Swiss-Prot record:
Disulfide bond sites: none
GO molecular function ontology, one term from the record: leucyl-tRNA--protein transferase activity
Example of a GO cellular component annotation carried by this entry: cytoplasm
Location of this chain's protein in the cell: Cytoplasm
Record's catalysed reaction(s): N-terminal L-lysyl-[protein] + L-leucyl-tRNA(Leu) = N-terminal L-leucyl-L-lysyl-[protein] + tRNA(Leu) + H(+); N-terminal L-arginyl-[protein] + L-leucyl-tRNA(Leu) = N-terminal L-leucyl-L-arginyl-[protein] + tRNA(Leu) + H(+); L-phenylalanyl-tRNA(Phe) + an N-terminal L-alpha-aminoacyl-[protein] = an N-terminal L-phenylalanyl-L-alpha-aminoacyl-[protein] + tRNA(Phe)
GO biological process: protein catabolic process
Gene assigned in the entry: aat
Segments of this protein annotated with the region Disordered: 1-21
Presence of keyword Cytoplasm: yes
PANTHER family named in the record: LEUCYL/PHENYLALANYL-TRNA--PROTEIN TRANSFERASE (PTHR30098), LEUCYL_PHENYLALANYL-TRNA--PROTEIN TRANSFERASE (PTHR30098:SF2)
Function summary: Functions in the N-end rule pathway of protein degradation where it conjugates Leu, Phe and, less efficiently, Met from aminoacyl-tRNAs to the N-termini of proteins containing an N-terminal arginine or lysine.
Keyword Nucleus: no
Organism of derivation: Leptothrix cholodnii (strain ATCC 51168 / LMG 8142 / SP-6) (Leptothrix discophora (strain SP-6))
EC assignment: 2.3.2.6
UniProt protein name: Leucyl/phenylalanyl-tRNA--protein transferase
Amino acid sequence: MIPWLPDDSDSAPFPPTRLALGPDSEAPGLLCAGGQLSVARLRMAYRLGIFPWYSQGQPVLWWSTDPRMVLQVAQFRLHRSLKKTLRRFLVTPGNEVRIDSAFADVIDHCSRTPREGQDGTWIVPEVKAAYVALHRAGSAHSFETWVDGELVGGLYGVNIGRMFYGESMFARRTDASKIALAALVAFCLAHEIAWIDCQMETEHLASLGAQPVPRAQFEAHLRRVVDLPAPKDWFYDPSSWARLGDRGPGQPSPSA
């Protein structure tokens, strides 16, 4: 039996993450169930490296996976093809990267994007509402790819201190989500956010430089960064691309 959180308290503590179900169980990383998706509860969870993930009809399920998939932004792999795509994107009229201009739309698109190996979505209506509330409280943000006024890709996640926790992404055009991810990496480099939590290991994330780290190492990093000042200005700064250094798209001329 896994522990249950009370539904009438935002301050009841989570169980120690070492009690999460192990790799040989049917649900590796499952820590506890129950409780509410309030802003206070979500902030408490993310500070500890715990995240909610469940399907329609299930109770709220809380997870602490081991290992944890992490993108250390200094290790981000901007492949040649994506670098070329970025250069073209940045000089084409009507193309934009935005931050937090359409958070609710981003999470809605993420909820409707089919995922290989998943039947339905974990971004159920109460999850959408909870993260929109977290966004309004200043702790959840979206990075968005726009073409001619149309939202064509993006991602959203949670920020606590100097940590960013990626939640989900979508693309309605080729590489649109990768452009948003590159913008997030550039933002993190500019604001001294060293790690982006990716939660689950996938080949796609690994191809971009993400690696699994032991839970103990992940939690030690959280303890160092979650109480540091969070970024205050969540807006797109074109100069942030320079933070990618030689890997970045540079400042191409219109003829590039």
